[in-house]
């Protein structure tokens, strides 16, 4: 298993159903590549992909910066986050980016009313600079880091 860090490794959560795996996992894989590329090969500065069922059953993952991909009907984590996170981007009431970045944790929900809208949410998250904003916050120098 590759190394993970509760503060620097981003957890991408997709739904567990066959439909969610078919449509949302490729989006998560693309986003993981974007995150890993920005991490510059540093061990913890990367992303991992897990399904919502595993995320819910693994409390240790809850401390990680989390990005749920897929609609509330197909992703239990997105279902929860969509109810509590503020809306940052919405287009035509079909595509939604919700996020909360504070000292208690970094949580994001990227979803749409269908697969194309969810893809638009993921792309907007990157193109609008929100991914870079997230990574700047979580990957900034920490005084407790030992060099």
Task: Give, region by region, the residue ranges found by the protein language model.
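Solvent-exposed alpha-helical segments and adjacent loops
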Residues: 1-147
């Amino acid at each position: 298993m590759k190394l993970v860090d509760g503060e620097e490794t981003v957890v991408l959560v997709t739904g567990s159903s066959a439909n969610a795996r078919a449509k949302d996992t490729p989006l998560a894989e693309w986003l993981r590549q974007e995150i890993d590329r920005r991490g510059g090969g540093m061990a913890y500065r990367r992303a991992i992909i897990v399904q919502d069922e595993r995320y819910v059953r693994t409390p240790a993952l809850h401390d990680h910066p989390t990005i749920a991909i897929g609609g509330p009907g197909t992703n239990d984590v997105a279902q929860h986050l969509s109810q509590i996170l503020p809306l940052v981007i919405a287009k035509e009431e079909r595509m939604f980016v919700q996020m909360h970045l504070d000292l208690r944790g970094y949580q994001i929900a990227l979803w749409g009313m269908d697969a194309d809208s969810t893809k638009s949410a993921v792309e907007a998250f990157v193109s609008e600079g929100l991914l870079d904003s997230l990574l700047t916050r979580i990957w900034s120098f920490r005084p407790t880091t030992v060099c």
